[in-house]
Each structure stands twice: as C-alpha cells, then as structure tokens.
C-alpha cells in the first residue's frame, strides 16, 4: 500500500506519516517543512519497517533534483549549490523589476493570480526556501543540515528603488538559496542577492 500525505505542516502530518510507516506502508509527500525538520527520524522508521519515504515533490516541483542528488551525482564531490527555489518570490521580484512596482503592489497581483497565498509569510519571509535548502544541502553535502542553521532573509524589505539602482549597474535581484561546503564546514543561507544580468539565473 502507498499513502500520500497532503495535510501539510508538521504536527498532525508527522503523526499520520509515522503511523503509516510503522504499519509498513510507503509514504509519498511534498511536505518540505516536515521533511526538513523530521526526515532522519522518518527515514529510520521507514528503514526499520522495510517501506519507502519519497519526497521528490518537496523541492523544486517538476525538476527531479532529489533523484539526481541521490542517484545521478553520487560520484561527484559537490562543494557549492545556488538556485532560485521559490516561485512566489521570484514572480514578485520579477514584477517589481519589469514594471517598477513596489513590493505591496507586486504581492497583491501575485495573490490575485493565485501565485501567492492569502498569508504569504512562508514564501516572502524565506521559510519555504529555507526548508528546501536544508533538504537539498543535506543530500548534496552528505551531512544533516538543520533548517535552523540556514541564515534567512526574505524580500519584504526590498524596494523598487533597490531594484532600480541594481539595474543601473547591470544587476538583477533574486532570492537565492545558497549552500557551500568548504574547509570551515557547511554554510547555508537564503537572502535577496544581486547577480549580474548575464548570469544564467538572472532570466529565471
């Protein structure tokens, strides 16, 4: 049997998933918050009961990044990762850049179009990106990277002026999830970042 968890959050969802795994049922979930906070505990239960815990959809939706990290690049030593992992904030920042709109105007349009939740905190304050980075960095760097270790800054303080000044100098502002694994250990952060207009991520 396969159980698909769509509850969201950690409390009830985690209890439900634990119960299913203990019954030997494979679980599929897109719950990035639960996975970032509880994956090791849940994976131990799954292994003990000879069932699976699959969460490909928890990070970057249609891109099979988790499967790639697990199976496709195991022979590689990854030292750095960087990407745009939240569509809501990317839409808002792109709208601000293209139309010269302020943050609130761009947010309201995103909400009207269904790109942003009624309460957008999880996205615009960087929590969503933080959970995803915690999951991806843990896999890429082969060590548990707690979400609490991720330095987090959202986009709520970004102004149209910030974006316009960056544009004058040939830069684009994006909310990036950045992970580095060096001699001093793992560094993980989510924050608005100016990148050159010629950078591959600038046109995302």
Describe these PLM feature segments.
Residues 47-128, 135:
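Rossmann-like NAD(P)H-binding beta-loop-alpha module
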Residues 23-26, 87:
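Glycine-enriched alpha-helix->loop->beta-strand junction motifs that scaffold or abut catalytic
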Residues 7-14, 18, 78, 87, ...:
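Short, composition-biased local secondary-structure segments
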Residues 8-10, 58, 86, 193-196:
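Short glycine-rich anion-binding loops that position phosphate/pyrophosphate groups of nucleotides
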Residues 7-23, 30-72:
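Rossmann-fold NAD(P)-binding glycine/threonine-rich loop
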């Amino acid at each position: 049997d396969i159980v698909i968890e769509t509850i969201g959050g950690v409390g009830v969802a985690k209890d439900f998933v634990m119960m299913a795994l203990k019954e030997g049922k494979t679980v599929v979930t897109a719950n990035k918050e639960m996975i970032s906070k509880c994956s090791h505990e849940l994976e131990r239960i799954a292994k003990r009961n000879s069932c699976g815990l699959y969460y490909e959809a928890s990070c970057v939706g249609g891109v099979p990044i988790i499967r790639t990290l697990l199976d496709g690049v195991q022979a590689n030593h990854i030292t750095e990762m960087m990407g745009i992992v939240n569509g809501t904030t990317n839409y808002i920042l792109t709208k601000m850049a293209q139309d010269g709109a302020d943050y609130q105007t761009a947010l309201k349009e995103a909400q009207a179009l269904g790109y942003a939740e009624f309460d957008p905190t999880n996205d615009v304050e960087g929590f969503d990106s933080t959970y995803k980075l915690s999951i991806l960095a843990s896999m890429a760097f082969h060590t548990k990277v707690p979400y609490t270790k991720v330095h987090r800054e959202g986009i709520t303080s970004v102004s149209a002026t910030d974006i316009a000044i960056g544009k004058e100098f040939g830069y684009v502002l994006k909310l990036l999830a950045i992970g580095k694994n060096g001699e001093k250990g793992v560094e993980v952060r989510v924050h608005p970042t100016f990148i050159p207009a010629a950078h591959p991520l600038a046109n995302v």
